[in-house]
């Protein structure tokens, strides 16, 4: 099965199925000497663990096992393998579905491609695979924090005249100062849930009462809801991206769209750009292009929005097709989310970090030697 590896230099390969023995990830290309310990993973997984009223009742501890690539608390420069055992799997929940293609899922598509499929919760197509990405994101973020290239003057945002910027180009768009070591930060938040626009809601924020009530009604009806989340990446040095086919937004789009529940992405002002004049779109005190120009980071905040589809596993009766070609009416049982907005956020964070880590390494030794 192809397509399990992402990245060019900093590569991420995930493995395992939703209700198999374990899932995991192998990260290659990470430089040696990066501090990395188990606590780095557990802190992130504690935040990402489903716990709310509108989230799955499946409770995986996600206790990481570092199998290789780390010694005495630092990376070795060799492949890093991290294993996450599945301890709360219930494959029997899906036995009634083994000859049924669930609408909105990858069941039929996988069988059409491979002539067989893992019907236990979707196998590789399950959201469970995302935990392996989160683990890889932990490593990528550590690399971004500690890799010396980030702190060199070569990779800082500069004005067109080559002089260092004065710090701020617009409200919320801070450019890294020349020669400083501002850490890259990735912040993802929901800006619309169940069709209700909202002020940014982080993964740890309480829901506004209006949205909470709407989701409660949707859950009561045995249905699900979608969302729009926004990601803002601050202190990204100017110059990252590989035109023309590996532009920064192209790589970010591929990374984010590879997340199973994401169905759309827009950078900066996104589709609103179609309604703007050139003079409006080019306003230097705005960030309508989302911090990327010509496929290369320009030192402003990178901003994009991602569309999260409604969870396809719902308790309502739906028309479904069977392996024999019949159409039946069936309601899906089991442990499923009402809305994925909170659970998708750490996955987006991880994929963004992976892209930036890879792009930083792709910038090339020749550039580093000029510093």
Model regions and ranges:
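Short Gly/Ser/Thr- and charged-rich N-terminal loops/segments
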Residues: 154-159, 177
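Generic N-terminal targeting/processing segments that precede catalytic cores or assembly contacts
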Residues: 1-151, 155, 182-371
